[in-house]
Amino acid sequence: MAAESFELIAELREFTGKSAARRMRRFEDKVPGTVYGAGKAPQSITLLQKDLLKALESESTFSSILTLKVGDKKQKVILKALQRHHTKPKIVHIDFQRIKASEKLIMNVPLHFLGEDDCPGVEAGGVVSHLQSEVEIRCLPADLPEYIEVDLSHLQLDESVHLSNLKLPAGVGLTSAVDEEHDSPIASVHMPRVSKADVEAEAAEAALAKEAATEAAEEEETEKPASEAEASGEAEQADTDKKE
C-alpha cells in the first residue's frame, strides 16, 4: 500500500537560536524546525504545536511523503527527525528532508503483523514475540509504502520469520544486506516462560484456596450437629403435644 500524502502548514522563522526557539515554544506554542535537502539551502521554519501533534497521531505521517506549505510555496518532504519534550506531550524540534522524484530515499517503515492470533503456534499455546517493529528501506518516492505486511499465519511453535521472508513491494529494497549469516528474525513463536515468582505465586494461591475450602468444610460440620439437635428437639416437642 502506497503511503498517503499529508499537508502541513509552516511559516518561515525570522529569528534563530536557542533563546528565540524557547520563547516561541513557551509563548506562541509553536515548534521550530528545519527543511533541507534536494540541493537547496536549508530553511528555518515554525509550525503550530497543535497541528503537528494531530498529524503525528497517524502512524502514516512517519512513513509518508508530506506536502509542506511554507508561505505560498509547497514542497515534497519526509519527516527526518523529531525531538519530543522529556516530560510533556510536546514537540521540541522537527526536521524535514526535501525529496526529488528521481532520487531514491531511505526511510524506516513500520511492520504490520497479520494472522498471528490464528497461527498453529499460538493455537498450541505459544506466544508471538515481535522482535522488530520497523525496517529501513530504500526506494523512489513514488514507490514508498505506508507499511509492510508480515504474514505470521503459518508459524509453528519455535519458528521465526526473518528479513529474507519479507515480501517487499516492487521497487523497494532493504538497506541492509541479507544473506545466510545476516538474516535477522523479526517475529517468533515460543511457549511462554514461567518464572520462579509465577510458580511461587500460583502455589501460594492454591494453598490459600485449599485452606479456605477446609475452613468452610469445618464450619459446615460444626453447624450440622446443632441443626440436627434442633430438629430432634422439635420432633420430641411435637410428640409431647400430640400425646397431650
Curated annotation (Swiss-Prot):
Alphabetical UniProt keywords: Ribonucleoprotein, Ribosomal protein, RNA-binding, rRNA-binding
Example of a GO MF term: structural constituent of ribosome
Superkingdom of origin organism: Bacteria
UniProt feature coiled coil, ranges: none
Matching Pfam families: Ribosomal_L25p (PF01386), Ribosomal_TL5_C (PF14693)
Sequence ranges of Low complexity compositional bias: 204-215
GO BP field: translation
Region (Disordered) residue spans: 197-244
One GO cellular component, as annotated: cytosolic large ribosomal subunit
Listed PANTHER family: RIBOSOMAL PROTEIN L25/GLN-TRNA SYNTHETASE, ANTI-CODON-BINDING DOMAIN-CONTAINING PROTEIN (PTHR33284), RIBOSOMAL PROTEIN L25_GLN-TRNA SYNTHETASE, ANTI-CODON-BINDING DOMAIN-CONTAINING PROTEIN (PTHR33284:SF1)
Subunit structure: Part of the 50S ribosomal subunit; part of the 5S rRNA/L5/L18/L25 subcomplex. Contacts the 5S rRNA. Binds to the 5S rRNA independently of L5 and L18.
Function: This is one of the proteins that binds to the 5S RNA in the ribosome where it forms part of the central protuberance.
Family, per entry: Belongs to the bacterial ribosomal protein bL25 family. CTC subfamily.
Protein's name in the database: Large ribosomal subunit protein bL25
Organism: Coxiella burnetii (strain RSA 493 / Nine Mile phase I)
